[in-house]
């Protein structure tokens, strides 16, 4: 029970955490109880303990900064008269209705045959005729012909390499008349070879697509004569019309708060420097369900608004019902505020964009009224581990070729990657809301990889989707180590497999059907490659352990010898190597031609390329095994979660590497031993695969070290232009990240309950504005009582979230913790603030170091 009338020694400690003047603190120190303290803060001497602490939220929040918040018109009251911060603009709802998916072709055909029309689709516009559409279709037919032709030739060579030439010597009548074992012995080698040949054709066609994409990107970038690039449609200096309002939205969920708000601040300041700030608003859309992180987000939002004078321009909202993950978060924004903006730029938690880039995107949208989405090509930067720096180098050197190549083949029917892109709001709201996939199981429910689907729906609705591959000023970060990358890949794998259910949905453009197919192949190629290697090993075992059948026809006069053509094997191997590695060589040639200084010079960039090629060869089999596991997990319905421990230096501990890579190492050893037993000479061909698996543990650990990454940077290895001449936005992001980490708020939920100002901020930003109905009051009392009884460590997540979202319950818990001197809460709070920059403004009272006692006790 609350004992507010006794005078606690901790009253001075409470006042020490309010930014009061000496006179104000001395005056309030004379209060005889917490009730009187809150009454005097609220200027309401008649208020009871619970009412007084609620009424004091405003003074506790604004003390020392009232003018700042009032000038920005940030203070308001809710329907119950409680003070609240205007952390988001007024809601003006827009109708957002997702169209149900009709994924079953047979049902659609049956309904048509029985005269039952399918449900009408929302009206869609036709993309106006344009020359680029005809050119794009011709280019894609050429690409298809090149891929198929190249695959047929390679398949013919592969067929000649295999020892058993065709099924013509297999007699069906003889098979039906002989024993099952004899049939298996006779057919098995041919079945293996046929399976290997089919898998080879699929994989070679996949490699061929990447090769031709990179080659055309190389020619586009080398000549600079791309008359269809969308960035050429704007002069780049046109004034932005007042009605072209753009919302920058950053959906986040349990992210690194210092880094998120550092990037947001750098982007905001760059937009302000461009002179177009009045055309942009910024929204942080949080789906965070970790209460400590949620409170840190609140404080970070307040800090960044103060530091940039961004009140009324930078907004924050945390959803309490996390429906449909990221796509649901964007739907919620569109429903509440989307009608107020003409365009929306979606940022990732690690995105940074320059003001000029953002302004250029708006100008391009204005100049191209048929464009629905314009995607930039984000440049990876900002990480220092050896693994991340090699990946940054690879994406920065090779990535532009593939991005330009994608644009060459797709033109205005291209990709959207979910971030660092501008979207036209009206068609997005009308056509791109995502309904859950029908049915049950792992591939039903909320869509995980929303970006490809939204691009397909935008094009289906008659709007273009473009890649502005040459637009500078768009940045992102990559995972710091292999295991973090694989954790991300598991989500993407499941999402891309789900998206393939939309392959036959009515109205999808063929290009986006191909995008769904390539999304699947990005991960399905791994188990296909693994199966190819397993079958090749099985064929080796067959040739080694089974006696060859030289006479398989009645009255056969001459033996049927297995055939080997090593010259064809060498030719095919050389061709495959060219397809895999020529794009990397072309990338370096392009850098030589354009200027290699920003990459460390010609020698260093070439050496970096060779080292990266070796590293990618080491990691390819490791990724193959993991991606195979991810695909199997998705089909078996295993949950797509992977909880990695926190790593301050972003490095991988040996224990985690052994746990994650141990099975691969054992597989590599066993596989190598089997092949060595079957045919030691074949081990040389398999060595790159099994050797990589055996070395996966040390490679994963060593490549995650920041020290090695910085040492390589000092030697100008894996250098990228953003490290050679760092843009101002990235410099600012790095500076603000370090500052934010220094001022990071720890134990946020405890701070929101105990700390006077943090509690006031949390109450003013709480989103649940319930009334005083009896059931609600009973639930509040139950939650507060439970929190007082079990303390912060005993509270479950749902109770924490409910308390943080309810300003009434949070103020009552705050009052009771201090009035009853609840050690479980106050001791954790004291420990949290000892080394925290958000420390008391005055030294703690000596008596407050231990358990507070009542005055006169």
From Swiss-Prot:
Q: Which UniProt keywords apply?
A: Cell inner membrane, Cell membrane, Glycosyltransferase, Membrane, Transferase, Transmembrane, Transmembrane helix
Name the species this protein comes from.
Pseudomonas putida (strain GB-1)
Q: How does it sit in the membrane?
A: Multi-pass membrane protein
Q: What is its EC number?
A: 2.4.1.-
What is the annotated localization of this protein? Answer: Cell inner membrane
Function, as annotated, reads: Involved in the biosynthesis of osmoregulated periplasmic glucans (OPGs).
Q: Name one GO molecular function term.
A: hexosyltransferase activity
State which pathway it belongs to.
Glycan metabolism; osmoregulated periplasmic glucan (OPG) biosynthesis
Gene coding for it: opgH
A GO BP term here is:
glucan biosynthetic process
Which cellular component, as a GO term, is one annotated location? plasma membrane
Family listed: Belongs to the glycosyltransferase 2 family. OpgH subfamily.
Q: What are the TM regions of this chain, as residue ranges? A: 142-162, 196-216, 515-535, 572-592, 606-626, 682-702
Name it.
Glucans biosynthesis glucosyltransferase H
